[in-house]
Amino acid sequence: MHEMSLVTGILSIIQEEMSKNGVNKLQRVKVCYGELTNIVPDSLQFAFKIFTEGTSLEGAILEIEKIPLMLRCSNCLSLFTPEDKQKIFFITCPSCKKEVAYNVETGREFYIQHLEVE
C-alpha cells in the first residue's frame, strides 16, 4: 500500500507550506494522480484520515482527482486515450491505424493541486 508513503509526503509538504506562510488551519487539500500510478483513492483517503488524527490537520478534507491516461502517437502526433489501459504496450493509433511508439502525455503524475487554509 504505497498510499501511506504518499500521504506521509503530502503531509510533510503541507506542514512545510503552512509553516512558511504562518497558517495554522488546513481546511482542504486537492491532489491529482494519473491513471498509471495505481493509486487507490479509498486507500489514500483512509491513510490521510489516520495520519491526520490528533494533529493540527485533523478534519481537513482531502479531494482526489484522477488524470486520464493520454498518449501521443509518434507517427501522426495524434493525442488519444487507449481503450484498453491494461495493454498499453500494444496499441494501434486510432487516427493513423499504425502500431508504433507513443509518448505518455498524462497519466503518471501525482501532485498537490491546491490547499485551502484559514
UniProtKB/Swiss-Prot annotation:
Keywords from the UniProt entry: Metal-binding, Nickel, Zinc
Record PROSITE patterns: HYPA
Parts forming coiled coils: none
Any GO BP: protein maturation
Binding site for Zn(2+): C73, C76, C93, C96
Family to which the UniProt record says this protein belongs: Belongs to the HypA/HybF family.
Function: Involved in the maturation of [NiFe] hydrogenases. Required for nickel insertion into the metal center of the hydrogenase.
PANTHER family: HYDROGENASE MATURATION FACTOR HYPA
Descriptive protein name: Hydrogenase maturation factor HypA
Name of encoding gene: hypA
